[in-house]
């Protein structure tokens, strides 16, 4: 876990000083009220974006207080990973009086900016969000929010405040060690082609770097876009093995497509793991229902959610 102390929250005065106009004018611009010239409006909005200032939607005497909400920002609800994380967060917050409120970004940096802006305007008691890679605007908002910020799932980078997760580079590297140690050399990779899925990218980088240290390169790779599914795993496995039938191992970027690949290979009579080895990533419960075990890496999703919630709730420093 990496930590860094947050700064004090920004105020209208900060935006006023940065833009060179009065606090009253700043307030009118940010609330979209009153007659303000286009040039002044742009000057104020630019200063607010640069500083990371988010207007406070809580009125009157409550304006200096925080609400009993924890903003949870995740990239997706369509896979099996983040519901487990949310379960851990919810379970840990259950006796604290804090309630998680979820925003989904669909792996879009601009969408993450918008979700964070809206959530921070209600002055939550903390923020939990996935990953360490964010836009400059998002980092500015979080860095100046003056509340606990926990970035989850990844520790390969510098956190804004606190990071809780695993090293994906190490996960990829250690899987390569296991595969090479078992004697496999003709290795194929099947994974997502999403530039904003930074954790999958880091795992693959760690995997390939360790292979290279042993003089081995990926013999084939197959990428897909969009969500993961068993059917997609079947299709991609058929495609890569039709093109490169002498592969002796397939490394999948997640368990869902890995499970689909395993089922396809079993239906066609592959000797697993003798003729062909397979591995995925995440350690999801789905694997327990398969007729054969798929090698995987446990990403500790529930534990990550629980620890992030403990930090936001002040149970753990």
Predicted regions located by residue number:
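N-terminal helix-turn-helix DNA-binding module of bacterial transcription factors
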Residues: 1-68
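Amphipathic helical "hinge" segments at domain boundaries
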Residues: 38, 42, 51-118, 122-126, ...
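Hinge/beta->alpha junction and helix N-cap segments in small-molecule ligand-binding domains
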Residues: 75-84, 102-111, 164-174, 190-236, ...
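Flexible loop/hinge segments that line or gate small-molecule binding clefts
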Residues: 107, 130-174, 256, 282-294
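Short, well-structured alpha-helical segments in soluble
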Residues: 110-123, 231-246
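Periplasmic-binding protein-like
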Residues: 123-131, 188-191, 223, 244-254, ...
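Short acidic capping loops at alpha-helix termini that bridge into adjacent secondary structure
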Residues: 186, 218-221, 272-277
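Flexible loop/turn connectors
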Residues: 243-317
């Amino acid at each position: 876990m990496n930590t860094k102390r947050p700064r004090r929250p920004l105020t209208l005065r900060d935006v006023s000083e940065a833009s060179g106009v009065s606090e009253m004018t700043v307030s009118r611009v940010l609330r979209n009220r009153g007659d303000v010239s286009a040039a002044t409006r742009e000057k104020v909005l630019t200063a607010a974006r640069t500083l990371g200032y988010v207007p406070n939607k809580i009125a009157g005497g409550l304006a200096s207080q925080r609400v009993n909400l924890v903003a949870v920002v995740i990239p997706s609800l369509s896979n099996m990973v983040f519901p487990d994380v949310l379960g851990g967060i919810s379970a840990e917050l259950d006796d604290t009086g804090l309630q998680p409120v979820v925003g989904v970004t669909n792996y879009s940096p601009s969408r993450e900016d918008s979700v964070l802006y809206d959530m921070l305007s209600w002055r939550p008691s903390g923020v939990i969000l996935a990953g360490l890679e964010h836009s400059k605007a998002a980092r500015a908002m979080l860095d100046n929010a003056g509340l606990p910020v926990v970035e989850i799932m990844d520790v390969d980078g510098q956190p804004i405040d606190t990071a809780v997760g695993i090293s994906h580079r190490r996960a990829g590297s250690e899987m390569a060690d296991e595969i090479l140690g078992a004697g496999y050399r003709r290795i194929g990779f099947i994974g997502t082609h999403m530039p904003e899925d930074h954790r999958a990218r880091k795992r693959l980088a760690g995997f390939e770097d360790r292979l290279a240290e042993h003089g081995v390169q990926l013999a084939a790779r197959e990428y897909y876009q969009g969500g993961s599914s068993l059917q997609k795993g079947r299709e991609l496995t058929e495609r890569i093995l039709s093109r490169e039938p002498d592969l002796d191992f397939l490394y999948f970027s997640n368990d869902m497509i890995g499970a689909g690949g395993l089922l396809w290979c079993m239906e066609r009579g592959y000797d697993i793991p003798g003729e062909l080895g397979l591995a995925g990533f995440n350690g999801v419960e789905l694997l327990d229902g398969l007729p054969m075990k798929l090698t995987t890496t446990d990403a500790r999703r529930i534990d990550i959610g629980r620890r992030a919630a403990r930090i936001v709730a002040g149970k753990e420093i």
